[in-house]
Amino acid sequence: MLSQYKNIQVSVDGSKEADLAFSKAVAIAKRNNATLEILHVIDTRSFQNVSSFDSAMVEQVSRMKDYQARAVKAGVKDSHYSIEFGSPKTIIGHDFPKKHNIDLIVVGATGLNAVERLLIGSVTEYVTRTSKCDVLVCRTKEIANALEK
C-alpha cells in the first residue's frame, strides 16, 4: 500500500538539486493534499560578522516567499516557509521534522556546501541515514548521467 503523506518537508538552498526537490515536493503535496513545509537552514558557523548574516537573511526571506508563491500557484493548499539557524544536518534530519510532525523529507542529492560535503559528509547522506521518516533524494539529470559513467 502506498503512503499518504500529510506533512512534507522540502529543504532548499538555491542549488539546482534543491529546485528539483522543491518541484517534486510540490507535486507530492498537491497529489496528497498535504501540508508543504519549505525549509532553509542558515549555517551560522559560516558567518564571520553580523552584517554578512543580515544580508543573507534578507535574501533568504525573499527567496522563501518566492518558493511559497510558486507552491500556491501550483495548487498546494497549505504551505509554510521557515528559516532556521544552526547545523543543517540536525535541523533538516531531526529537529524540524519532529517539531512539525513531518512524514516525508524531500532533499536534493547535493547542495551548495562543497567544503562540508568533503570534510564531514553531505547533509543528504546524514538525513537519509538517520531520519525517522521517509526521505526522497532528488538528482538532476546531469548528476544521474555522471553516475552512469
Residue ranges and their predicted role:
Residues A21, Q60-R63, V123:
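Hydrophobic alpha-helical membrane-association signature
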Residues L39-K65, A144-K149:
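Acidic, proline/glycine-rich short linear motifs
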Residues E37-L39, H80-E84, L136:
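General small-molecule cofactor/ligand-binding pocket signal
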Residues L2-D54, A74:
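Small/aliphatic-rich secondary-structure junction motif
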Residues K73-I105, A144-K149:
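Structural beta-alpha unit
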Residues K98-A146:
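Gly/Ser-rich helix-loop-strand patches that form or flank binding pockets
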Residues A21, Q48-S51, I91-H94, R117-L118, ...:
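Short, well-ordered secondary-structure micro-motifs
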